[in-house]
């Protein structure tokens, strides 16, 4: 879940409360997004807040219909280095989402920028599923392959969408206070597994 495509192991979690802001959605969707983020934080043992003392908002989510729109967002190139090159790659890949992270001096997540091009695939998810999925994916620096073939969510028999139990357990283990906020050694997975086993 945390092994990069180049074979390196990189784990990072938030080192501060998450202060979200969402752009490009209607009020009812905004409420759903923020509720999902709060729910995932509670499940992980982390917390949200209204304002980050340094950044104001530290989890910024942008919804739009075309990657080209990003080039016109004021000062976005200051948050996303080489913005034009990033947009070019996303357009070429026909991607529908992109996440960029910033880290503090300890290597913990300091900020996360989420960009969602709302195509047919994302529209079919529905607001609740999309919100929950994006909240989960913003909690760690997941590998590029983590959810490529399997969603972090599962639909129950009653139609409710929830986190897969193993993902919820991984969040709780990763945010355990005794665990590091940053790890670059694959042995970290053994510590995560041990925390999950103890919790069960």
Give residue spans per PLM region.
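Acidic/histidine-rich, surface-exposed loop or edge segments in extracytoplasmic proteins
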Residues: 12-23
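Disordered inhibitory propeptide/activation segment of secreted metzincin zinc metalloprotease zymogens
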Residues: 1-14
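Surface-exposed short loop/turn segments
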Residues: 67-133
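Glycine-rich, aromatic-bearing surface loops/beta-hairpins
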Residues: 111-200
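Short, non-transmembrane amphipathic alpha-helical segments
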Residues: 32-46
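Acidic helix-start/capping segments at beta-turn-to-alpha-helix junctions
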Residues: 50-70
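PEST-like low-complexity, intrinsically disordered acidic/proline/serine-rich tracts
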Residues: 44-48, 69-76, 86-87, 192-200
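Extracytoplasmic
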Residues: 15-17, 56, 109-111
């Amino acid at each position: 879940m945390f092994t990069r495509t180049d074979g390196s192991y990189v784990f990072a979690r938030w080192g501060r409360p998450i202060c979200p802001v969402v752009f490009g959605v209607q009020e009812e969707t905004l409420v759903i997004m923020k509720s999902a983020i709060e729910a995932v934080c509670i499940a992980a043992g982390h917390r949200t807040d209204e304002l980050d003392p340094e950044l104001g908002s530290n989890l910024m989510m942008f919804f739009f219909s075309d990657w080209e729109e990003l080039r016109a967002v004021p000062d976005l190139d200051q948050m996303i280095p080489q913005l034009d090159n990033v947009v070019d790659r996303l357009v070429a890949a026909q991607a529908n989402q992109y996440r960029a992270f910033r880290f503090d001096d300890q290597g913990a997540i300091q900020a996360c920028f989420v960009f969602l091009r709302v195509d047919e695939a994302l529209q079919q998810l529905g607001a609740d599923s999309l919100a929950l999925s994006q909240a989960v994916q913003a909690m760690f620096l997941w590998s590029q392959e983590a959810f490529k073939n399997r969603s972090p969510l599962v639909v129950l028999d009653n139609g409710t969408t929830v986190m897969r139990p193993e993902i919820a357990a991984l969040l709780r283990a990763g945010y355990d206070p005794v665990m590091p906020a940053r790890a670059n050694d694959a042995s970290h997975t053994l510590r995560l597994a041990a925390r999950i086993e103890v919790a069960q």
